[in-house]
């Protein structure tokens, strides 16, 4: 929530039950951060993305990226890897993107983007586990 008058910003995430404490698992919060920074969730929800399906059910997608996006993403992943298994974070991130689909049913292009990124993340993790 943003209270512009009092210059106050509060984050509330109704994550449900995740983790063994009332505060949940910190990996979920890290995945939410990666979901935003690397995955481009906010960019997509702000309309800075195009997505379409071609004849062979291929999803074509373009997401606006600031000049330093790749560097920031790489740096965040390095920070994550210092403390957690990046594949576990990517798994949660992929599930976060997939879980957004029903919440954005009024915007098919956005759903395509979320679906595509979610499946990409899950495939990245599954491909690593089969090696």
Across the structure, where does each feature detected by a protein language model lie?
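Conserved protein kinase catalytic/activation segment
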Residues: 1-11
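Regulatory N- and C-terminal appendages and interdomain linkers associated
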Residues: 6-7, 84-131
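Active-site activation/catalytic loop segments of kinase-like enzymes and analogous catalytic loops
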Residues: 8-9, 15-76, 94-109
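General secondary-structure edge motif
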Residues: 13-14, 81
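A structural motif corresponding to the C-terminal end of an alpha-helix
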Residues: 74-85
């Amino acid at each position: 929530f943003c209270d512009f008058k009092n210059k106050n910003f509060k984050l509330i995430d109704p994550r449900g039950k995740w983790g063994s404490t009332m505060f949940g698992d910190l990996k979920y919060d890290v995945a939410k951060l990666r979901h935003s920074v690397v995955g481009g969730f906010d960019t997509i929800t702000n309309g800075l993305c195009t997505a379409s399906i071609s004849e062979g059910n291929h999803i074509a997608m373009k997401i606006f990226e600031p000049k330093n996006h790749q560097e920031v993403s790489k740096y965040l992943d390095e920070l994550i890897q210092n403390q957690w298994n990046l594949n576990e974070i990517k798994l949660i991130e992929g599930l976060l993107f997939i879980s957004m689909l029903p919440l954005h049913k009024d915007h098919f292009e956005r759903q395509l983007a979320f679906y595509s990124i979610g499946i990409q993340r899950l495939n990245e993790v599954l491909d690593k586990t089969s090696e």
